[in-house]
Curated annotation (Swiss-Prot):
It is an enzyme of class 6 (ligase). SUPFAM superfamilies: Anticodon-binding domain of a subclass of class I aminoacyl-tRNA synthetases (SSF47323), Nucleotidylyl transferase (SSF52374). This is Cysteine--tRNA ligase. One of its GO terms (biological process) is cysteinyl-tRNA aminoacylation. The keyword Iron-sulfur does not apply. A motif ('KMSKS' region) lies at residues 272-276. Its main location: cytoplasm. InterPro entries: Cys-tRNA-ligase, Cys-tRNA-synt_Ia_DALR, Cys-tRNA/MSH_ligase, Rossmann-like_a/b/a_fold, tRNA-synt_1_cat_dom, tRNAsynth_Ia_anticodon-bd. HAMAP family: Cys_tRNA_synth (MF_00041). Gene3D superfamilies: Cysteine-tRNA ligase, C-terminal anti-codon recognition domain (1.20.120.1910), HUPs (3.40.50.620). Monomer. It holds the Pfam family tRNA-synt_1e.
Length: 458
């Protein structure tokens, strides 16, 4: 099978043809580690985790290099550390650890390489020096700026007019810039800043601009040309636009990334997520609410990755009900490992990662189990269900673990025995009272014809 991806650069869905099938290269913008990741950040990670799984299936793990960076030098980091009264290293270490915990919770595979910006300052300086030498960058008032007007096809990714692009974002104006749109490659240290956030350079003590960081790390591990660059749609301009400009100007014959993939925005109850609106939801918030990671992952895959996605309680509850349905479908069935995943399921994912269609196909297997007339039919559908769900990072537990985790089985069994004894004594009121008590605790009882009682979580 062949995979098709929507390329933001060409505005077309294209057949993915890597430069080298034995060395498929993908770079994805990772987190800026100044605060705990929110649910919107997580959508991006889950989307490119799915793409990574697809690429590995086609080209094998040894042939796919997935680079996702950690931005650990940034103005937001300096401000946040100062507000908390802790060192920058303490903050970035803490938030990076939290990010990794969150991604494990969401069943995301680790990237092949996860470089930190602070460990690649030398590469950034090397690229900036190239840009100065070629005339694409200039020094002004201890800053180094990139001259946007000298970049060929600067607007090719956003497909917008230059003046319109800069109306949509805040441009830091400066009398030292040649043009208001020029962006910073290197900025000087401020007297009161943490020394750990500044580095020696030919232009004095300072730190890199945001955009040069990704250009440097992608070049270090993937070279001047690579296959896929991913990130959120909010990064198209200015971040990805500026990456392309500086990288193509720094390296002759560089096309930078061939395929640009961008995921859509995530809202909360129909509104943009922001701390001022009080609807800022971190992954840690969901973990603290005891919402299982699989539920959140399924929710994040329910909409096509390029479409907007709205977070709300009903959407999370619907994802939980879907997983409950799938786990209930495979209960007490002997699952067989299958060598080849169903072609319609794989085709849905190979068609620009159509995860909603893939989820529908999994759901159809669950329905088929409940309507099956023999064990062989049940086993066939259950084996396909679990294989497909596993492929997209779901159903990582047994049905027993899913329904009974964090449940006191002894407590429930004791109440069931009390109820059975009450029924023997014809104390129907007590029997109903026990059933209702467990029902209020989301435990459903089912009386069997042989006189026994089984239970499950709602």
């Amino acid at each position: 099978m062949q995979i098709y991806l929507f390329n933001t650069l060409t505005q077309n869905k294209e057949l993915f043809e890597p430069e080298d099938q034995t060395n498929v290269k993908m770079y994805v913008c990772g987190p800026t580690v100044y605060d705990n990741p929110h649910i919107g950040n997580s959508r991006s990670v889950v989307v490119y985790d799915l793409l990574y799984r697809i690429l590995v299936d086609i080209f094998e793990a040894k042939s796919v290099k997935y680079v996702r960076n950690i931005t650990d030098v940034d103005d937001k980091i300096i401000e946040r550390a100062a507000n908390l009264g802790i060192s920058i290293n303490e903050l970035t270490d803490k938030v990076t650890k939290e990010f990794h915990t969150n991604m494990k919770y969401l069943f995301c595979l680790p990237p092949t390489i996860e470089p930190k910006a602070t460990q690649h300052i030398d590469v950034m300086i090397e690229i900036i020096e190239k840009l100065i030498k070629s005339g694409h960058a200039y020094i002004a008032d201890d800053h180094v700026y990139f001259d946007v007007l000298l970049a060929p096809n600067y607007t090719e990714l956003s497909n917008r007019k230059l003046e319109d692009m800069f109306e949509s974002v805040r441009v830091e104006n400066s009398k030292t810039k040649k043009h208001p749109q020029d962006f910073v490659l290197w900025k000087p240290a401020k007297p009161d800043e943490d020394v750990h956030m500044n580095f020696k350079s030919p232009w004095g003590l300072g730190r890199p601009g945001w955009h040069i960081e990704c250009s440097a790390m992608s070049y270090k591990y993937l070279g001047k040309n690579f296959d896929i660059h991913g990130g959120g749609a909010d990064l198209i301009f200015p971040h990805h636009t500026n990456e392309i400009a500086q990288s193509k100007c720094a390296f002759s014959n560089s096309t930078y990334a061939k395929y640009w993939v961008h995921n859509g925005f995530l809202t909360v109850n129909g509104e943009k997520m922001s701390k001022s609106l009080g609807n800022f939801i971190t992954v840690r918030d969901l973990m603290d609410k005891q919402i299982k990671g699989e539920i959140v992952r399924l929710f994040l895959l329910t909409a096509h990755y390029r479409r907007p996605l709205d977070y709300n309680d009903k959407a999370i509850e619907d994802a939980k009900k879907t997983l409950d349905y799938w786990y209930r479908a495979i209960q007490n069935i002997n699952i067989q490992k299958i060598d080849t995943l169903p072609s319609d399921f794989m085709q849905s994912l190979f068609d620009d990662m159509n995860s909603p269609l893939a989820i529908k196909i999994i759901n159809d297997y669950a329905k088929a189990i409940f309507t099956a007339t023999n064990e062989e039919e049940k086993q066939f559908n259950a084996s396909n269900l679990i294989a497909c769900a596993n492929f997209i990072g779901l159903m990582n537990e047994t049905p027993h673990e899913w329904f009974n985790k964090d449940v006191d089985e002894n407590y429930i069994n004791n109440l069931i025995n009390e109820r059975l004894e009450a029924k023997k004594q014809k104390n129907w009121g007590l029997a109903d009272q026990i059933r209702n008590k467990l029902l209020n605790e989301k435990i459903i009882l089912e009386d069997k014809p042989n006189g026994t009682t089984i239970w499950r979580k709602e």
